[in-house]
Amino acid sequence: MVGLVPLLTACDGVSRATHQTLHVVLVPTGRVEWLQQDFRDQLAWQPLLDNFRQIYPNVHVQLSVHQEAQLNDFLTKAKSRGLGPDLLLVRSPTAVSLLERGLVLPIPETAAVRNALSLLNPTDLSRVRTAKGIAGLPVFKEGTLACYNRTHLAQAPTSIEALQAVAASGRTIGLSVEPIGIWWTAGAFGAQHAMGPIIVGNDGGRKPDLPRDRQALRHWLRSLRAMALQNRVDVGTGPEELTRGLESGRLSWIPCYSITLQRLDRTMGKRLGVAVLPSGPSGLPSPYSSLRVWALGADSSPSQQRLALALMQLSLDPLVQREITLSTRMVLPANRNVQVPVASSGRLAVLAGAQRQFEQGTALMSLPFSADRVQRVLPIVQNVISQVMVGVLSAEQGADRLLELRPRAGAGR
């Protein structure tokens, strides 16, 4: 193993003769907490843990899983007793929120950490760099894809028009009213630049154009309403409902999160097909890419903190990143120097394609934003989308309600 390991073994200052425990908390995305067991037991962690154990044979890494919705309460209570975890694996907005609340520490920019940071794409680093410091160290990326039943469809539709034709032919497709699950359609229908500030609470210095944004939102919502009215379009509340519908054969096509692929591989086998999401009349889709980061616990001893930093840095080692990518085929490496073997893996080629679509979308989604903001706004957005899709609100009324959520000009998150 090359790259980071010499720095770890030479400079960490941790005694290898002392038996210690490193408590690592894994936090699944709130929308996929029903995959909690898969999240803890997946093979992704084994290459990292095996290599860490070779360097620190007397350190026991204790893995536990906590729900995202209860994380603030868990950490607040643990901190009051000085028993918080040493390391947390969370989404980048969650790390930003925890740092703002003082529940995690900023990543110290030591020489070894700066070496690790140099391995990252600047756009990924920008998602965790805040006024209080770096909220977390990126380790891998999860994407939004299209999953389909290969016994029902010979290939995935590449356009929304083709997707609607699938439904018209008698095959049922699934859509989600959950905002992140339907975010891909904002790009396809030309509304992602209008929706970006609403989601992240930051206009990124973009000069507001209210008439243009209102028109874009109306068009998007009208298009979603038209899709919902079509026969054989099943509107679900979230990824669990859609995933189970695909597994059972009731649905032929759904938008899906890459983190669900391990389960779908197990339940569907060769019936599972994976593709990038379809384009629309306004251009490419806007799939969301979730950046997973290590956040540093606030209650560690100096020795435990050095171990936590060592594990974080080791996770970016090229060989570890490559092993994680190849063993799961559902995440992409954060280390920009790791070549993803897209030529030999159709699954990884799809993931890389979805990541390119995300990077070509609005730059606002690559800014640091807080999970607290998202948790306040997304239920309102979901309610508006749901009411428009079932006809309770008109597209015009829905657009006006969404615009009420936008930040003031020049506002931060």
Predicted feature locations:
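Glycine-centered hinge/linker elements that transmit conformational signals in sensory
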Residues: 202-236
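Paired acidic/hydrophobic, glycine-rich loop segments that form the ligand-binding mouth/hinge
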Residues: 86-89, 252-257, 273
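Extracytoplasmic/periplasmic substrate-recognition and gating elements
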Residues: 154, 266-332, 366
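Long, aromatic- and glycine/proline-rich binding clefts that accommodate carbohydrate-like moieties
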Residues: 326-379, 387
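Conserved N-terminal structural module of periplasmic/extracytoplasmic solute-binding proteins
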Residues: 4-94, 405-413
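Ligand-binding "clamshell"
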Residues: 98-106, 131-133, 192, 264-282, ...
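Extracytoplasmic/periplasmic solute-binding protein
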Residues: 135-139, 144, 162-209, 251
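Hinge/lid segment of periplasmic solute-binding proteins
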Residues: 92-145, 155, 273-275
